[in-house]
């Protein structure tokens, strides 16, 4: 009897979790088009009064084990893109001490900033790379009558197997700027 009750409770929790609607805090819609593909809004958060996060993946992917994820964050306030970027660069520099894979390049043009960085999640003993992740983030200053702050548009690519990781390193070696150029070409997402 206890086992049935536990199974029923687990089922109910999963059912209600599946019913939870993802909030479109930035009013961008439940789909976002990038690189001729439609990504669906699968996760969002409003962890602080002035901070919003939204994540999009391809319909056939899982947010816990995605190949590519689009992230759009907005920090409201009198902030400059350079300051928000500096915070990430400081974090990467501090993490480099424990994670030798971390590497990054910052781009700046017309007071807009981008960062292209690679990092990894390693096994507890540090001998094996479990996840290899490449991110390209672009920072925009938003200054409209309704919203002021910094918007981050990011693309996160992940590799989980040795073959996928080798492919990612090959792309970084031979076609590194392809993704950077695609992110450069996007229009500023129109948040409301």
Q: Where would I find each of the regions flagged by the language model?
A:
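Sec-dependent signal peptide recognition
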Residues: 2-8
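N-terminal "mature-domain start" segment
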Residues: 19-49
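Secretory pathway targeting signatures of secreted, lumenal, and periplasmic proteins
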Residues: 37-77
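Glycine-rich, often proline-containing surface loops adjacent to acidic residues and nearby aromatics
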Residues: 64-74, 114, 146-155
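Hydrophobic h-region of N-terminal signal peptides that target proteins for export
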Residues: 9-18
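Mid-chain, structured segments of secreted extracytoplasmic proteins
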Residues: 66-103
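Surface-exposed amphipathic alpha-helical segments
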Residues: 147-192
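Signature of long, low-cysteine stretches enriched in small and polar/charged residues
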Residues: 94-141
